[in-house]
Curated annotation (Swiss-Prot):
GO terms for cellular component: cytoplasm. This is Glucosamine-6-phosphate deaminase. Belongs to the glucosamine/galactosamine-6-phosphate isomerase family. NagB subfamily. The lineage of its organism: Bacteria, Pseudomonadati, Pseudomonadota, Gammaproteobacteria, Pasteurellales. Pathway: Amino-sugar metabolism; N-acetylneuraminate degradation; D-fructose 6-phosphate from N-acetylneuraminate: step 5/5. Allosterically activated by N-acetylglucosamine 6-phosphate (GlcNAc6P). Its EC number is 3.5.99.6. Disulfide bonds: none annotated.
Length: 270
């Protein structure tokens, strides 16, 4: 595990964006050999997407030979709905960069056969070999993608019933009306995420502190699905100060010393 303890949400966003760009540019992708990037939705990655757009506009990176796979999508919510994850990704990222439409992959929650759609998605990922970098967030209860507490840690892409906590958390996007939030979603599995070459999880805000503690100091536990990433060879956790509040002081000190002088290297403090 590589743990990056930063101070502010903006630092987390800039660090993450620069890491993604470094990975893409070092890979030197081509049409025949694209860089495969996994992406999340939600509030946490928004500023990272804004920073990626800024750096793209500054000529620091091209997404022309990048293939993306999103983590999840609601079931039975039209793609054109403003709160669908299709809408989120296009409005907040894809419409502002040079990615090719055919290289964008998002689960279709409006098919007649959800199981077939999930199998298709897994096969599409396998057709590229692997996802080189999967960025994600983490829920207050430690869920990753829509792998809610007690999900199988070897799970693959499938349909999931959302917990009441998740429905309440996501109701802020639906006029704070829990009844408007879809009850089901298609999501990559924990096993799908573990197959990625590198996983980078972003955590900001004090409400994520218990999940961060479970990921860093806790034991592997299906009630905190983020803890499964302790088994990953290249797991990167990037947090602001508020999200570190439940960690032991010596834990933060240990990882800070490992990173050395982080400031001025992988992120810009703006």
């Amino acid at each position: 595990m590589r743990f990056i303890p930063l101070q502010t949400e903006q630092q987390v966003s800039c660090w993450a964006a620069q890491h993604i760009i470094n990975r893409i540019n070092d890979f030197k992708p081509t049409a025949e050999r694209p860089f495969v990037l996994g992406l999340p939705t939600g509030g946490t990655p928004l500023k990272t997407y804004q920073e990626l757009i800024r750096l793209y506009q500054a000529g620091k990176v091209s997404f022309k030979h990048v293939v993306t796979f999103n983590m999840d999508e609601y079931v039975a919510l039209p793609e054109e709905h403003p709160e669908s994850y299709h809408s989120f990704m296009y409005n907040n990222f894809f419409n502002h960069i040079d990615i090719l439409p055919e290289n964008i992959n998002i689960l279709n929650g409006n098919t007649d056969d959800h199981n077939a759609e999930c199998r298709r998605y897994e096969e599409k990922i396998k057709s590229y070999g692997k996802i080189h970098l999967f960025m994600g967030g983490v829920g207050v209860d430690g869920h990753i993608a829509f792998n809610e507490p007690a999900s199988s840690l070897s799970s693959r892409t499938r349909i999931k019933t959302l917990t009441q906590d998740t429905l309440i958390a996501n109701s802020r996007f639906f006029n704070n009306d829990v009844t408007q939030v879809p009850k089901y979603a298609l999501t990559i599995g924990v096993g799908t995420l573990l197959d990625a070459e590198e996983v980078m999880i972003l955590a900001t805000g004090h409400q994520k502190a218990l999940a961060v503690q479970a990921a860093v100091e806790g034991s592997i536990n299906h009630l905190w699905t983020v803890s499964a990433l302790q088994m990953h060879r290249h797991f990167l956790l990037v947090c602001d100060e508020a999200a570190q509040q439940e960690l032991k002081v010596k834990t933060v000190k240990y990882f800070t010393e490992l990173e050395g002088a982080v400031a001025g290297t992988d992120y810009q403090d703006k």
